[in-house]
Swiss-Prot record:
Residues 150-171 have a biased composition (Polar residues). Residues 309-419 form a coiled coil. Transmembrane segments: none annotated. The keyword Metal-binding does not apply. The lineage of its organism: Eukaryota, Metazoa, Chordata, Craniata, Vertebrata. This is Growth arrest-specific protein 7. Residues 77-110 form the WW domain. Gene3D superfamilies: 2.20.70.10, Arfaptin homology (AH) domain/BAR domain (1.20.1270.60), SH3 Domains (2.30.30.40). It is linked to A chromosomal aberration involving GAS7 is found in acute myeloid leukemia. Translocation t(11;17)(q23;p13) with KMT2A/MLL1. Its main location: cytoplasm.
């Protein structure tokens, strides 16, 4: 696939990546490397190179194929007078009548009133007011419209400043807790950012109902809770090993004390030697367990306890960062709703004054209409600006969510691997302790094999004999 070209779907800052490629939505990139893992390397038309998420771009059908820019189709396809063609951010072409401000997905025919495709229904816009549709979007879309931060959402979704209509936008998107998603009834199949993995960055975009209350918990909050739970589990494992160490130390002390016990110290012969070695082996075993407990402390317990000492503080900063972006998004959404309401009121006022003009023509009414038209236009501009700021805020939140969830994913893998390695070290030390313990009883085994009751009896008799002349019968 190297050498193929792609078009960017979303803006990407690349600020948090050392070799990230910064781009806006709609730019062309030539692919240089396309390894597995979800990150590709590419080169922009200005020569800048860098890495970017593969899910942020859409491959063109063939290497070198570039969709024509807005308005270019009119050079190859003859349109009726007054019509211009444009591309939506999803690549679907639509048409605008510069005279009537009518917008349609169907290519107009040269004959007035006849669609390009027989039997097709033209999806045209409602009447415009001062160059703005009912949704507050301009009838003539600028070529550099800012795209919303949604992943693939289909041809007929809200197109930002080039939306066909408010009704169509409402049917294709749904806003939940100030985050805009594709409508579930019309949602096209979305490509996962990391389709071959159950990655955090793909499954925690929505909020979840709080089982302990009537509120909701953000998906990112669930990930943070898992991270903090992992830190707590790591701490409890360290405490468990500490208890294990305490048991080893107490066991070693008791073994050493028992080895000094004088019970059966008067046993003699080869059995006495074996018994003495049994007591000595207890002292040796006590030393082995003391060393085992010391290694457990330095090589298992301490690393588990000290791993990521500032983890909670770091997670708190991360939580605040994403929460601030979410608050900003909520603020932008409130501004959009306020601007939308203001536009509706201005349009209603303009419509009312227009009706008054039809009833009674007067200079005062015409002046009122001009003022109402200016206010309606300003309200449309305000709504466009608010929607653009909202989309920018959602784009920033989207990018930070992807980056941060992937970082949390990496941290979780790192934590699990660290614990696994130290538990392996624990089992290794345990095996070594068993071997050392075995070595302490080997001398005992050797002496026990040498125990000879007959030899012991001989030695004892030689040392304690009282005479070998046996008694005889008494004579009369």
């Amino acid at each position: 696939m190297s050498g193929a070209r792609c078009r960017t779907l979303y803006p990407f800052s690349g600020e948090r990546h050392g070799q990230g490629l910064r781009f806006a939505a709609g730019e062309l990139i030539t692919l240089l490397q396309v390894p597995d893992g979800g990150w590709w390397e590419g080169e922009k038309e200005d020569g800048l190179r860098g890495w970017f998420p593969a899910s942020y771009v859409q491959l063109l059908e063939k290497p070198g194929m570039v969709p024509p820019p807005p308005g270019e189709e009119s050079q190859t396809v003859i349109l009726p007078p007054g019509w211009q063609s444009y591309l939506s951010p999803q690549g679907r072409r639509y048409y605008v009548n510069t005279t009537t401000n009518e917008t349609t997905w169907e290519r107009p025919s040269s004959s007035p009133g006849i669609p390009a495709s027989p039997g097709s229904h033209r999806s045209s816009l409602p009447p415009t007011v001062n160059g703005y549709h009912a949704s507050g979007t301009p009838a003539h879309p600028p070529e550099t419209a800012h795209m919303s931060v949604r992943k693939s959402t289909g041809d007929s979704q809200n197109l930002g400043s080039s939306s066909p209509s408010k009704k169509q936008s409402k049917e294709n998107t749904i806003t939940i807790n100030c985050v805009t998603f594709p409508h579930p009834d019309t949602m096209p199949e979305q490509q996962l950012l990391k389709p071959t993995e159950w990655s955090y960055c793909d499954y925690f975009w929505a909020d979840k109902k709080d089982p302990q209350g009537n509120g909701t918990v953000a998906g990112f909050e669930l990930l943070l809770q898992k991270q903090l739970k992992g830190k707590q589990m790591q701490k409890e494992m360290s405490e468990f090993i500490r208890e294990r160490i305490k048991i080893e130390e107490d066991y070693a002390k008791n073994l050493a004390k028992l080895s000094q016990n004088s019970l059966a110290s008067q046993e003699e012969g080869s059995l006495g030697e074996a018994w003495a070695q049994v007591k000595k082996s207890l002292a040796d075993e006590a030393e082995v367990h003391l060393k085992f407990s010391a290694k457990l402390h330095s090589e298992v317990e301490k690393p588990l306890m000290n791993f990521r000492e500032n983890f909670k503080k770091d997670m708190k900063k991360c939580d605040h960062h994403i929460a601030d972006l979410r608050k900003q998004l909520a603020s932008r959404y409130a501004s959009v709703e306020k601007a939308r309401k203001a536009l509706t009121e201005r349009q209603r006022d303009l419509e009312m004054k227009t009706q008054q003009l039809e009833i009674k023509l007067s200079n005062k009414t015409e002046e009122d209409i001009k003022k109402a038209r200016r206010k309606s236009t300003q309200a449309g501009d305000d709504l466009m600006r608010c929607v653009d700021l909202y989309n920018q805020a959602q784009s920033k939140w989207f990018e930070e969510m992807v980056t941060t969830t992937l970082e949390l994913e990496r941290l979780e893998v790192e934590r699990v691997e660290m614990i696994r390695q130290h538990l392996c070290q624990y089992t290794q030390l345990r095996h070594e302790t068993d071997m050392f313990n075995q070595s302490t009883v080997e001398p005992v085994d050797q002496l026990l094999r040498k125990v000879d009751p007959a030899k012991d009896r001989e030695l004892w008799v030689r040392e304690h004999k009282t005479g070998n002349i046996r008694p005889v019968d008494m004579e009369i």
